[in-house]
From Swiss-Prot:
Protein's name according to its UniProt entry: Small ribosomal subunit protein uS17z
Assigned protein family: Belongs to the universal ribosomal protein uS17 family.
Keyword set, alphabetical order: Cytoplasm, Ribonucleoprotein, Ribosomal protein, RNA-binding, rRNA-binding
Compartment list: Cytoplasm
Organism field: Arabidopsis thaliana (Mouse-ear cress)
Amino acid sequence: MAEQTEKAFLKQPKVFLSSKKSGKGKRPGKGGNRFWKNIGLGFKTPREAIDGAYVDKKCPFTGTVSIRGRILAGTCHSAKMQRTIIVRRDYLHFVKKYQRYEKRHSNIPAHVSPCFRVKEGDHIIIGQCRPLSKTVRFNVLKVIPAGSSSSFGKKAFTGM
């Protein structure tokens, strides 16, 4: 996924690759010729973002996007787009007339960096950022595989 498939040479804007010093011949990511940052908020930078060779300007770890605003959790509903997934958030809505709850959901498109491997059913934590496209305003910060046990171990809608 990190191969150069575009017609133009992809490079990180903050990294100078034409150095005449001892770093000659080293690939970005192997010799320290890679820009990455700690986004804070208690999220660790993935190993693939530090050691990888991909170039993604919309990645929160290696690009120019900052995370601010809401932090949300949900389940990956669709991973069919390129570098974009649909996160489904289930919730309960109270109907006053009947004194009951009804199930509802919302779909949120989110940009996924190449440092993550996301499949349908995985639990996702996303963070709000500036608008990345017409509909995308969130970025994937953490992926919890579907089979692992974590804080998502409880079933949804158990209060009924």
